[in-house]
Every structure is written in C-alpha cells, then in structure tokens.
Amino acid sequence: MLVAAGLTAGLAACDDKIEPFVAEGFTGTPVAFDASTVSSEALPGEIKLSWTEPAEDFSYMQIRYFDPLSKEDVCRIVSKGTTGLLVENTRARFGDYTFRFQTFNALHEGSRVTEVKAQSGPAPVTLTEVKRTKVELTKDQLSTDNQEPTEGPIANLLDGNTNTFFHTRWSSPQVPLPQYIQIDFKEEHEDFAIKYVTRNIGNKDGFPTAADLQISADGKTWETVASLSGLPASSVTEYVSAFVRPGKKFSHFRFLVTSASANSKYFHMSEFSFYDVEVDVYDPETIPLDE
C-alpha cells in the first residue's frame, strides 16, 4: 500500500491527503494517455470527465489540475480500469480547467503528460429567505370570476374571522374550474408568498387541492409562476407557501384554483394573505473573490 505523499518524484505534486492506493503489476514503459478519448460534461458546480479505458497497460494514472478557487494544485490518482472522474466545487466563471493526465508503472515511472481542457457549469445559486412582510389589502382590491350570489362575499377573505368565508358559485348555473381570486395592487411587487386558511365546515367538498399562482403587469396578460398541489382539504387549516421569485415585477396577482376536493366545480376559503418576501441571493459565480 503506497500513499501519494510518499512516492517518488513522479508524484511530487500530489496532495498529501490523497487516499492510499496499491501500485502493482506492470513494470514496462508506460504509454502516454490518449487525451482524444476524453469527453467532458459541464454540471452545476462540477466537471465530469469520462474516457475510454486505455488498451495500453499501466499501474495507475495521475490527473493534475490547478483549482483557481482554492488557488491550489490538485492531484487525483485513479487505478487502471477507471473510466471517469467527477471534479467537484468548480466554477463556470474560471473558464477552461486544464487537466494533465500521466500514466505510471509499478516502479512509479511516468509517461509523457497529455492535457485536456474542460469547463464547469455554473455553481448553483443559494436563496435564503430573510423576512416576510404582509401586504395590507382592502376589499376593493379583490375580485373573482365566479362569485356565489347568495353567500360568501370575497371581502370575507380579509376580515380576520375564520368563521366567515368566500365561496365561488355553487348555485345553478355552475361552471367548471379553473376559477380565481384576483388582487389588483396599487404598487409593484416581485418576490412573494401567500397564506390562506381553509373554510370552517364539516363538508368535504370545495377545498382547493391544486392552484396556479399567476402574475400580470397589466391585468390582461397572465403568466403562471408557480403551481401548487396537495393543498389541505380539511376544515380551518392554514396553508403557507414557499416564496416565489418570478424574476420580474407585477401589479396584479391571481390564485387560480385548478381542482377542488370531491371534484367540485367551486371552491371556498376563509382567509387569504399576500406577503412580500426579502430573499438573500448567494451566487458563487458573481461574489467577489479573495485576492
């Protein structure tokens, strides 16, 4: 068993924390690795290298590259028969990474070095919710496309009372879903979340079970920015959404119910709230790097 840090000059550049490995068998002159067999895939924050197993014999192969993020030379050792390497914690911002392949025999004599250039996909952005601020709404900002005329006015969604409710039309003539709650804001919004409370009722029908969250800048052209499913179908149950980042500002919003419990052609709800959300964005591809 040999540890990379204890090898001869051919491995001098290897990281001393590399895993131990066995180098045995072939003692002939190692043939240079054919770099033309290597393909690369740019993954999110990673580089995947794949190659055809060399026909030539060798004991192990060293793959070296410079990591511009850590500003360190990195050495990976793979055994014969290995046909791929996943390089983690990489960045698209650095462009080409140069990988140097070198085969070795059991005497740690190395072949000529061959090079392959490959690029990383962008590292994933991390989004962290900082706070939510409830938007105070008035009844004149609310509307629906299918109000039940005998009960459940839409203004009840804002009264803070879970014993009152809003109801779309259950009386004849019924129309099929989808049906919506619309908010016309007096200002623009962007990152947001919603909360609502289901109706206080013993019946099992009419609870929203799936809905689209839609936005519009003009109240005419609508875009779905999130779809919700598995919504609660039980009495006086609070639902709180994850935050939504539509990537644009809007001044009109719809909670568009696409299905309801018991296959109802209507839906009901007790309370509805809309929140502005402050989101912290950590983008590994754009943050300043230490000098």
Question: Where are the model-predicted features located?
Answer:
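Extracellular low-complexity, O-glycosylation-prone stalks/linkers
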Residues: A55-R76, T209-I215
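Beta-strand-rich modules
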Residues: V87-E115
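Pro/Thr/Ser/Gly-rich low-complexity, intrinsically disordered linker/stalk tracts
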Residues: D15-D57, R112-L137, V277-L289
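Short beta-strand segments within Ig-like beta-sandwich modules, predominantly Fibronectin type-III
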Residues: C75-T82, L231-A233
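C-terminal motif of bacterial Sec signal peptides marking the signal peptidase cleavage site
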Residues: G10-A13
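A short beta-strand element within beta-rich, extracytoplasmic domains
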Residues: H189-N203, F255
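Trp- and acidic/polar-enriched beta-sheet ligand-binding modules for extracellular glycan
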Residues: K204-E291
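Disordered, acidic Ser/Thr/Pro-rich linker "stalks" and the adjacent N-terminal cap
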Residues: Q119-K186, R199-D205, D280-E291
